Amino acid sequence: MAENTMWHETLHDQFGQYFAVDNVLYHEKTDHQDLIIFENAAFGRVMALDGVVQTTERDEFIYHEMMTHVPLLAHGHAKHVLIIGGGDGAMLREVTRHKNVETITMVEIDAGVVSFCRQYLPNHNAGSYDDPRFTLVIDDGVNFVNQTHQTFDVIISDCTDPIGPGESLFTSAFYEGCKRCLNPGGIFVAQNGVCFLQQDEALDSHRKLSHYFSDVGFYQAAIPTYYGGIMTFAWATNNDALRHLSSEIIQARFHAAGLKCRYYNPAIHAAAFALPQYLHDALSAQ
């Protein structure tokens, strides 16, 4: 792709978003995905896989703070965390901010994503790959959760959309494997698309997760470059109380963790679980 051209996202056929490409930093088709990273004056460095925006320097903090701090602070004493995907390192960066976490395992299917992001998205990983608690496993996420002997307190599925390599991370086999390696009272979260445009994705995840967890729901955040509205995150656990903790408990845990965030705060934590009526209606109808 030439510089000073427009890059158009291909996630939707009838509409979408575009970015002016000021400078192409990297573009290569790996064994699994077509990766590109370019610079844009408004959003900084932009990474896309198979024609779909995955992250930008400008707004990535919203996604990663909400995917990390909501489950970790709701759990309250997570020691062992599993990240599925997350090769850009930003999810890892946020998990490492929790000093009580003892081990962080990241399973990424494509080693090329990790090496590429270490070089071209240094602000995302911010040196977190060098944290002594971190272990990188190059493997398919479904295979890992169904074969590992490790168990975890929190599992974060930082998956792509359910097409191509990311499709397997929306299957019953994956969700069953996650339940298998979650400790009692553990929490599973996953990105679940923009529900206004991808409602079937949320409904499908809810239906499948409900076979394995007693408390299944969603929480949300507004992320500008995930086009089409509010981003939805799946939530699943067998400890029904964790989704309904008081603001005082979350505030105390947030203060004890010493976190300084740009988007997440205890009030956002509670409000994020309030869902639009159209999603409630769709969930009730299935």
From Swiss-Prot:
The active site is at 158 (proton acceptor). It catalyses: S-adenosyl 3-(methylsulfanyl)propylamine + putrescine = S-methyl-5'-thioadenosine + spermidine + H(+). Residues 5-238 form the PABS domain. It is an enzyme of class 2 (transferase). It comes from the Bacteria. CDD domains: AdoMet_MTases (cd02440). Its EC number is 2.5.1.16. Pfam families: Spermine_synt_N, Spermine_synth. Spermidine binds at residues 64, 88, 158-161. One of its GO terms (cellular component) is cytosol. S-methyl-5'-thioadenosine binds at residues 33, 108, 140-141, 165. InterPro entries: PABS, PABS_CS, SAM-dependent_MTases_sf, Spermi_synthase, Spermidine_synt_N, Spermidine_synt_N_sf. Belongs to the spermidine/spermine synthase family. HAMAP family: Spermidine_synth. Catalyzes the irreversible transfer of a propylamine group from the amino donor S-adenosylmethioninamine (decarboxy-AdoMet) to putrescine (1,4-diaminobutane) to yield spermidine. Homodimer or homotetramer. This is Polyamine aminopropyltransferase. It comes from Salmonella paratyphi B (strain ATCC BAA-1250 / SPB7).
